[in-house]
Each structure stands twice: as C-alpha cells, then as structure tokens.
C-alpha cells in the first residue's frame, strides 16, 4: 500500500486565496499587501478568472513591469480583458495612487522566469532571492517619459485573421493611442492579406522594430506595398525575407523599377547587421542594387536557394559592407558553371572574422575546389564549415581536409560522402562507404585531432532526408 505525503498550504497561501474570494476585503487590503505576495496572487487570480480582483491588483501593481505573456498562454480572454480594464482605471486617474509603479505591460515572448521565480519563492519563503533573480529587461528609450504606459508586443501575423488576444489588444490600444506607446521589436509575417497587415503597421511605431521576418509567397507587386514601411524601420537590426517571387505578368522594366524601390530603402537602415534571403527570385542580376545600398557592416549574410549570376557573385566579393562577416551562408546557390575566383576573393576579405561558412548544395565540383582552398585555410576564426551536397571525389576531399588542418577553432565539419561511395545507379554502396570512412579516419588522425567531422549522403529518394555519419564505423548522427 502506497502512502502519499500531503503538504498543507502555507498560511500566506490561505490568506491570499481568502483575499481573492472577498472583493471588499481585497479593496481595503491591497494597499498594504506585501510586495512579494502580488505575483503568486496575481497568477492565482488569473488562472481562476477572478476578474474584479485582477482589476484591483493591476491598479496596485508594485513593480514597474507586468510580464503578462506567459500567463495569456492559458486560454482565458476574460482574464486578459480584466487586466486591460484595470489599466484603463489607472490611465483615467488624474492623480497617481501612492503605490503606482506600473509603466510597462510586457507581452513579449521572452525567456524570462518572473512568475516561476516568485511562485517558487512563495513555496519556500525565499522572497529575497526572488528579487535578486529578476533579470533586467530592455525598455524602449525612444519613448521614455512621453506616455504613462508602454505596451511591448511581438507581432506574429500568420493567419488570415488575428487571434482573439491580439485583436482585443489592438482595439484597446487604438482607442487609447494618446495615453500609451505600443512598442513592437519583433515582427513576423507568415501569411495574412496585406490590407490587414497595413492596418496593423499603421498602429505601430515602426522606429521601434528591430527584427522583421517575412516568410510569405509574395510576388513583387505585393512587396511594393510593404516597401515604404520597411524604410521607416530605422532601428532594424535583422531582416529575413523568404519565398519572394517574380510574377510572370511583371515585365523586365517593371521588375527593375520595383527592385530599385525596394533596395533603396536599405539606405535608411543604418543599424542592419543580419540579412537573410531565402528563395528570393528577384535577386538574379540585381544583387548589386541591394549591396550598393547597404550602409552598415553586416555580421550575418545568408543568401540561400536563390539563382544568382556570376556577375552577382563578383559584386558580392567587392561589397565593402561584408568585410566583417561572422556568418556566410550561400547554400543552395548553383555554382557549377561559374568561376569561384569571386568566392575566393570574398573569403580572403572576411578571413579575419568569419566563424560560420555554409556552402551546402552549391554543385561545386573537383576542378573548382582548388580555387578556394588557400583563402579557406586562412579563415582562422572558423568554427563551423559545411560542404554537403557537392559532388567531389576522394582525392579532392582529402585535399580539402589537409587545408583545414591549421584551423584550430574548427569544431564542426560536414562533408559529402565522396563519389566513390556510390554505385553506377547513384545509390550509396554501404560497404564501400564504410571502407572510405575508415581510410579517411586514419588520414585525418595522422594530420590532427578533429573535434567533430560528419559525412553526409545524398538526399534519400524515399524520405527526402540526408544521413550523417561520423568517422567511427556504423555511427549514425541524426
């Protein structure tokens, strides 16, 4: 027979629950309630939908910030509305209450354990430790002191319509725009009619936005509607663009004009450090227009699964804004028929800073590899190098490994299984592959002690995935 140990609730917990049940008692007591009781009682009130208690607690909140996002993951729109009603009561007051410290309603999806820290403190009585463990959160300096309340939010526009929480919030903000500042640092557009996107962007201070991801199947005419908003995001640090297509109804002249309108917006983005472009078809033959408008030194540059001309690569190697790159990802760009001299020049230019290099699936063949080896061997800060999906032979692979031997910071290396590993029909010959891995293991360990080297196969025709193997026999790495 199993015996369970029942832990009775602490006196503070019982007092808090009693307070939530008695509205009249709550009104008279909150002004004198110890600060450490507010977070656990607020969680209790929110989960139990004690709306009147929530309104009162918001008005007496003893911290300058209310991080509400972790709590609204619970399906409780009624409790969320009660919090907004409590804020309304505060904003409508002519004179601030003695205890009013609340300045920030934080709806960002941040990794912060505010509620967990305080609930654990409640359980163990370690309130002093809870105060010490709170992490400072960056404010919005551009609006400091202008409005009594700042609302931080991350906008994920992924459905045809907004979720009920965001709809409720934006309607509330729209009706009180003179009393508060809506600050959005991260904007992610994954699918929504642009007329809806436009109405939301008009409510947000675009100068606050630091990260933007657009992952929609937009054609150029839709991109032109977004372009003016991009130019106003003057503090943008990270931009991700995916699946931008050229409509077949757009003439070459129209395409050039649209690309010019879009790329000239980069002249205004003087804080941009990270640029990611995946499956962006309008770059072909126009990369120089974008690069010439960059006014900052990029730290991250990713151009993947795009079609580029050889002239585009030449312009990339000559761009002054890429000389301090830490990450360069050109995976999925077909280079088979191109000279790799521009890539060699590019690697020479970033050798002092480059830490991550991805050249997967570029179709680089044996005769092209030698062009980049001297520059690659001078990338002394490199810690990750990926070269999967390039059809090279055993001799070329050995030559490549011998040139990376002096890269002491290299921790992860990914290479393709050499062509000798495959049969005439293109399928992997397992016995031959095992023999090649054993030969490579002996060769590499004669040269150096690698931290991690993986060899990958071609994509499986059945599952569409690759398999990765390290140098040890029969060891598969997912």
Curated annotation (Swiss-Prot):
Keywords: Leucine-rich repeat, Repeat
Domain of life, source organism: Eukaryota
Example of a GO biological process term: negative regulation of apoptotic process
GO CC entries: Cul2-RING ubiquitin ligase complex; cytoplasm
LRR repeats: 99-126, 181-205, 206-232, 233-268, 269-294, 295-326, 327-347, 351-378, 379-403
GO molecular function: ubiquitin-like ligase-substrate adaptor activity
Family the entry assigns: Belongs to the PRAME family.
Name of this chain's protein: PRAME family member 4
Gene label: PRAMEF4
């Amino acid at each position: 027979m199993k015996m369970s140990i029942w832990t009775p609730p602490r006196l503070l917990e019982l007092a808090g629950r009693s307070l939530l049940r008695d509205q009249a008692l709550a009104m008279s007591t909150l002004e004198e309630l110890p600060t450490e009781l507010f977070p656990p009682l607020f969680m209790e009130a929110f989960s139990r939908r004690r709306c009147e208690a929530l309104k009162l607690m918001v008005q007496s909140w003893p911290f300058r910030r209310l991080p509400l996002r972790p709590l609204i993951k619970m399906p409780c729109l009624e409790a969320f509305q009660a919090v907004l009603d409590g804020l309304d009561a505060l904003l409508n007051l002519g004179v601030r209450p003695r205890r009013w410290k609340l300045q920030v309603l934080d709806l960002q999806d941040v990794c912060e354990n505010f509620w967990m820290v305080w609930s654990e403190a409640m359980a163990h009585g370690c309130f002093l430790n809870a105060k010490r463990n709170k992490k400072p959160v960056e404010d919005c300096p551009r609006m400091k002191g202008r409005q009594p309340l700042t609302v931080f939010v991350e906008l994920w526009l992924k459905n045809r319509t907004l979720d009920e929480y965001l709809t409720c919030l934006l309607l509330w903000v729209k009706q009180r725009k003179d009393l508060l500042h809506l600050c959005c640092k991260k904007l992610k557009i994954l699918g929504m009619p642009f007329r809806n996107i436009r109405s939301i962007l008009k409510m947000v201070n675009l100068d606050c936005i630091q990260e933007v991801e657009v992952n929609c199947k937009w054609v150029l005419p839709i991109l032109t509607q977004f372009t003016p908003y991009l130019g106003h995001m003057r503090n943008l640090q990270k931009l991700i663009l995916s699946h931008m297509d050229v409509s077949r109804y757009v003439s070459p002249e129209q395409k050039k004009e649209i690309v010019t309108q879009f790329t000239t917006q980069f002249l205004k983005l003087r804080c941009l450090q990270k640029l990611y472009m995946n499956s962006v078809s309008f770059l072909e033959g126009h990369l120089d227009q974008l690069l010439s408008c960059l006014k900052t030194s990029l730290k991250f540059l990713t151009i993947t699964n795009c079609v580029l001309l050889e002239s585009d690569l030449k312009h990339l190697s000559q761009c002054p804004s890429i000389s301090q790159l830490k990450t360069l990802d050109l995976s999925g760009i077909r280079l088979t028929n191109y000279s790799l001299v521009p890539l060699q020049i590019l690697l020479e230019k970033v050798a002092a800073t480059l830490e991550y290099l991805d050249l997967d699936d570029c179709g680089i063949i044996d005769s092209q590899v030698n062009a980049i080896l001297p520059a690659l061997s001078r990338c002394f800060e490199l810690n990750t190098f990926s070269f999967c999906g390039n059809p090279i032979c055993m001799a070329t692979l050995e030559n490549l490994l011998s040139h990376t031997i002096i890269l002491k910071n290299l921790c992860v290396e990914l290479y393709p299984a050499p062509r000798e590993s495959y049969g005439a029909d293109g399928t992997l010959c397992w016995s031959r592959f095992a023999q090649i891995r054993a030969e490579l293991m002996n060769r590499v360990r004669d040269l150096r002690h690698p931290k991690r080297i993986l060899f990958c196969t071609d994509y499986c025709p059945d599952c569409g995935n690759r398999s990765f193997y390290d140098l040890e026999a029969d060891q598969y790495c997912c």
